[in-house]
């Protein structure tokens, strides 16, 4: 719930939804979206609501390794038949996603090391027909200091504060993202800095440079 509050009030959901809308455009189809590391389902729910308002049909599969978190997500999203959830160990090197149109993730990719992320992208690119959209923290010293001094003012749990610091420490810089994308063989992408201290990656695996 703490992470949901942060994502909502700091605009993370909005930036991901806007990126999805740019990808879908006016094409009439049912888009299959996979939410990697979906947590409590707040991003999947925000996406489903927004696409519904824009009269865009979709199915969303949220994937996470925590059974308790998924139970919470299923309860919260019960009224949305287009959302389903799957429990899986995403960090297992044998894990692969099912075919989808769009792969999204928010505040999860920092769990990967750079080498493992490169392998994950290489192994899963063939399953994504249209776009990959990741919204992640961008590592820098100022973000670390600001979070340390301001987190006590935020209505979030101690666990969420600790997770936030860990996420900043383990997140990738823009330079590291460029190296990861090159090694993964992704040539068509955009890296956009968005508030606060985040990177929004939109990549198009099927497009040629």
Language-model features, listed with the residues they occupy:
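C-terminal alpha-helical "lid/dimerization" subdomain adjacent to the S-adenosyl-L-methionine
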Residues: 137-181
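Conserved beta-strand signature within the Rossmann-like core of class I S-adenosyl-L-methionine
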Residues: 128-137
């Amino acid at each position: 719930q703490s992470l949901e509050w942060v994502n909502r009030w700091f605009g993370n959901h909005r930036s991901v939804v806007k990126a999805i809308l740019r990808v879908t455009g006016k094409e009439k189809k049912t888009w299959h979206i996979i939410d990697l590391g979906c947590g409590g389902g707040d991003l999947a729910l925000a996406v489903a609501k927004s696409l519904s308002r824009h009269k865009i049909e979709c199915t969303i599969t949220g994937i996470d390794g925590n059974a308790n978190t998924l139970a919470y997500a299923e309860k919260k999203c019960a009224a949305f038949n287009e959302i389903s959830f799957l429990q899986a160990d995403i960090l297992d090197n044998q894990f692969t996603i099912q075919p989808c149109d769009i792969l999204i993730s928010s505040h999860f990719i920092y769990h990967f090391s750079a080498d493992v992320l490169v392998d994950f992208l290489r192994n899963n690119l063939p399953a994504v027909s249209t776009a990959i959209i990741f919204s992640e923290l961008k590592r820098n010293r100022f973000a670390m200091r600001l979070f340390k001094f301001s987190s006590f003012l935020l209505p979030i749990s101690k666990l969420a504060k600790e997770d936030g610091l860990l996420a900043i420490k383990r997140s990738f810089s823009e330079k590291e993202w460029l190296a990861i994308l090159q090694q993964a063989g992704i040539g068509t992408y955009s890296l956009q800095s968005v508030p606060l201290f985040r990177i929004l990656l939109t990549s198009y695996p099927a497009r040629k440079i």
